[in-house]
């Protein structure tokens, strides 16, 4: 009796018969034999000391989770069928790059934004690949996250975080003019994101404008305070201060473009010019460089020709006028940097930083306790926590943990050093020089646990996944979602080859460690990890951390 098919509602359902079950069992047996044969071949590694192998400081993982501290392992091309995993709800925006849609993840019922980019040429294809690789390495609370992407012969489909407050352009259109305190809160976040881009990744965004700043919520500290995130790195560029940065064509949006970009010789300061334009618009309600036509506008931009309305000058603070002037200096060498902008007196007028990083002392203590208790049992646990945290920005506790991270990361570069951690503990918890030794001891212990990739600092998501209340990670649907990511062929089980692909294991020592990991979870010894085996393993680990 052979296998047969039947069609129901345009979907093919495979009817498994006895012959198929026998064939499947035979294939499984061959797979298992291959896996365990490989284990025998590399078992000798345990018996021979490796003189060149030096265990990494603070790491209990048998092989590195990531190669460079980025998120290559959890942000990947989804090889499944887009329509089977996402429901397209409605269009959100359209531009020269393509379209953006609101979509819903069918398994976890969470809304996402989907950016659809046509593949028009080989050059466009390579540019999209560059954008994806770039987004994989960006980890900042004020930059929208990339979750995964699909690709076919005609288009890329980038699945990103969805912020339901719309973009800043629409908010400006509805409000017309913002108070200085509200403008300060918005600009504080944009400058923080740019410090991270400019100093940590040597990255110029090149298209800072209200349409590329999205609102993800109103801050509870005040009804006129909006939490925002930066989007669209499609024309961004890595820069080198020692080299001339130029482009074959002028890119950016007319009203926000810096004069040096028009001369095709620019650096990261072109983003600061755009910020000056946005700040002007927020508090005045019009563009600083208006004109009767495009040439008139470009002429005013090149000469930095703008004025403040008399009504604004009468009521505006000297600090905001000065910051706008500092951002709109024609000479980029004289223009303020993102770091200096964030330290400008304007932001001290309204306690902007205090609003942005505010959390209760009880939450701060709870976070530190979670950090101290954090323990990594195996790579699969760490990858699971990383995947859940990265894909769940809507969880309120994650937002609060981002604030705690910002409290400690004083230079706002998105990389918490051991010294910053120690100073933060001293300032917010130990509160006194007599406790310096205790703060240093605690900072060392926490830092060595969290810096698993040994790059010398703690990134935001490393901090969040260690500090989060682990009860939030026990949800069966959330763990099913993560299991589905690991189960690349969607057959309901995780194989050795799938783990090898996820962890990018390429040497024989790491293959042995990976095989040991699989065998420690594979209770029925079938060479695969079922969801129940994975789920029970994760529950046991999470319960031990609560």
Predicted features along the sequence, with ranges:
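Conserved N-lobe ATP-binding subsite of Hanks-type protein kinase domains
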Residues: 99
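Conserved N-lobe beta3->alphaC-helix segment of eukaryotic protein kinase catalytic domains
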Residues: 111, 116-138
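Activation-segment/catalytic-loop signature of the eukaryotic protein kinase fold
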Residues: 149
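Conserved short submotifs of the Hanks-type protein kinase catalytic core
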Residues: 154-167, 171
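Activation segment signature within eukaryotic-like protein kinase domains
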Residues: 186-187
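Amphipathic regulatory helices of Ca2+-sensor modules
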Residues: 385-386, 416-432, 459-470, 495-507, ...
């Amino acid at each position: 009796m052979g296998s047969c098919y039947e069609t129901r509602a345009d979907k093919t359902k495979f009817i498994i018969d006895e012959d198929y079950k026998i064939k499947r069992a035979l294939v499984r047996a061959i797979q298992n034999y291959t896996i365990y044969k490989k284990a025998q071949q590399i078992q000798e590694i345990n018996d021979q000391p490796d003189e060149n192998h030096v265990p990494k400081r603070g790491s209990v993982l048998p092989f590195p989770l990531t190669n460079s501290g980025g998120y290559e392992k959890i942000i990947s091309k989804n090889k499944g069928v887009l329509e089977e995993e996402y429901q397209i709800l409605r269009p959100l925006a359209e531009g020269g790059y393509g379209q953006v849609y609101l979509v819903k993840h069918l398994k976890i019922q969470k809304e996402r934004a989907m950016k659809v980019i046509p593949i028009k040429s080989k050059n466009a294809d390579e540019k999209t690949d560059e954008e994806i690789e770039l987004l994989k390495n960006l980890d900042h609370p004020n930059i929208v996250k990339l979750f995964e992407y699909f690709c076919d012969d005609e288009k890329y489909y980038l699945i990103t975080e969805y912020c339901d407050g719309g973009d800043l352009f629409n908010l400006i259109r509805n409000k017309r003019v913002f108070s200085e305190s509200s403008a300060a809160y918005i600009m504080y976040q944009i400058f923080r994101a740019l410090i991270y881009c400019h100093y940590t990744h040597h990255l110029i965004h090149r298209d800072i404008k209200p349409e590329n700043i999205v609102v993800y919520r109103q801050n509870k500290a005040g009804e006129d305070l909006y939490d925002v995130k930066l989007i669209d790195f499609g024309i961004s560029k890595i820069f080198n201060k020692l080299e001339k940065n130029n482009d074959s064509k002028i890119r950016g949006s007319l009203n926000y473009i810096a004069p040096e970009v028009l001369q095709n010789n620019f650096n990261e300061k072109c983003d600061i010019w755009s910020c000056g334009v946005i700040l002007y618009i927020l508090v005045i309600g019009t563009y600083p460089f208006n004109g009767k036509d495009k040439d008139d506008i470009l002429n005013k931009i090149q000469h930095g020709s703008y004025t403040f309305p008399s009504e604004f000058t009468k009521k505006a603070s000297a600090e905001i006028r000065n910051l706008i002037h500092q951002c709109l200096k024609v000479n980029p060498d004289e223009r303020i940097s993102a770091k200096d902008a964030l330290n400008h007196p304007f932001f001290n007028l309204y306690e902007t930083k205090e609003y942005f990083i505010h959390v209760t002392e009880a939450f701060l203590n709870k976070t530190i306790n979670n950090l101290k208790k954090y323990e990594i049992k195996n790579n699969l646990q760490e990858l699971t926590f990383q995947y859940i945290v990265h894909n769940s920005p809507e969880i309120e506790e994650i937002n609060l943990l981002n604030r705690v991270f910002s409290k400690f990361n004083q230079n706002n570069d998105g990389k918490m050093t051991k010294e910053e951690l120690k100073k933060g503990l001293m300032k917010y918890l130990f509160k006194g020089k007599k406790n310096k030794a205790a703060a240093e001891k605690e900072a060392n212990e926490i830092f060595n646990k969290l810096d698993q990739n040994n790059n010398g600092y703690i990134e935001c998501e490393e901090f969040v996944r260690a500090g989060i209340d682990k009860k939030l990670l026990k949800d069966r649907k959330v763990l099913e979602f993560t299991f589905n990511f690991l189960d690349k062929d969607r057959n309901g089980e995780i194989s050795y080859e799938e783990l090898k692909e996820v962890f990018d294991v390429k040497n024989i020592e790491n293959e042995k460690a990976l095989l040991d990991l699989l065998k420690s979870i594979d209770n029925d010894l079938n060479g695969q990890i079922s969801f129940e085996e994975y789920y029970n393993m994760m529950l046991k680990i999470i319960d031990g951390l609560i």
